[in-house]
Amino acid sequence: MLTYFHPDQSLHHPRTYFSRGRMRMPQEVPERAARLVAAAFAMGFPVREPDDFGIAPIAAVHDTHYLRFLETVHREWKAMPEDWGDEAMSNIFVREPNALRGVLAQAARHLADGSCPVGEHTWRAAYWSAQSALAAAAAVRDGAPAAYALCRPPGHHARVDAAGGFCYLNNAAIAAQALRARHARVAVLDTDMHHGQGIQEIFYARRDVLYVSIHGDPTNFYPAVAGFDDERGAGEGLGYNVNLPMPHGSSEAAFFERVDDALRELRRFAPDALVLSLGFDVYRDDPQSQVAVTTDGFGRLGHLIGALRLPTVIVQEGGYHIESLEANARSFFGGFGALRG
């Protein structure tokens, strides 16, 4: 399977993040990408560096002021006369009212939580992660049956104008929007442990892109503010946003009950192409997991997705149990490839 990854995606190296009242050691680390690249090579996938599609297809999804913020905030942060640290991190979170005067106010608007420090190379890493998604979308748009965007940093929590949940640019949404150039109806299926509230926000009022998410109950669990089953879309998009939350502690069987529900929604929508937001953080030993999916379970998931026989862009999202990433990737792609050739 065609796989896209740029070495600069590994340049983002966060030092810490803030969650639930504590400063914590980062989980979204460069080694995640290294393990997944190794798995791709072991499976015989051609791993290619993406072309540079420029900023325009990213700006088709994200606010241009936000993109400028991501590109410049670290330089402005380091230029402050006081020592504000090596990473831009906000301790103020106010979208509105916000005059956006000064870098601290801009960070208050554009960093939605404490999990997205912006270091010297964060923008470059996020930019090339998005370019990997665009390259995979271009390959599928041009006739490849499937392509893998090995995205890191991940993306599905990134909002139109704000970073959050380890995510800066919404790779899956960028890929889905790019697919719309050829495909009238695009579905995004999200199987990450956490609800992709960024994807939901971007497509919430649209009927040409269906978003279906299987995730842990967001009550007191990231993203906490969205991902509930009564969020169905708005305006023309009413009915085209489907959330399938799982109780914490769910079994693998319960996970696949939600997968069956999601597949029914996809078949009802009858998309021309699919974007899969693939998270390995539903693995039973993942530090973020609240369900019990096994390595073999990822093979079953791949088999079910492959059985749809849709042009498919697979976009990497979470997965933080470093030791299991290669095995889980091999299992998923083995199941997917068993039907796709």
Curated annotation (Swiss-Prot):
Coiled-coil ranges (or none) = none
Q: Which biological pathway?
A: Amine and polyamine metabolism
For this UniProt record, give its keywords in alphabetical order, as a comma-separated list: Hydrolase, Metal-binding, Zinc
The entry's active site is: 157 (proton donor/acceptor)
One function term, GO molecular function aspect: histone deacetylase activity
* EC top class, as a word: hydrolase
Q: Which residues cross the membrane?
A: none
Which domain of life does this protein belong to?
Bacteria
Which EC number(s) does UniProt give? Answer: 3.5.1.-, 3.5.1.62
Q: What is the catalytic activity of this protein?
A: N-acetylputrescine + H2O = putrescine + acetate; N-acetylcadaverine + H2O = cadaverine + acetate
State the free-text cofactor note.
Binds 1 zinc ion per subunit.
Q: What does this protein do?
A: Involved in polyamine metabolism. Catalyzes the deacetylation of various acetylated polyamines such as N-acetylputrescine and N-acetylcadaverine.
Report what the protein is called: Acetylpolyamine amidohydrolase
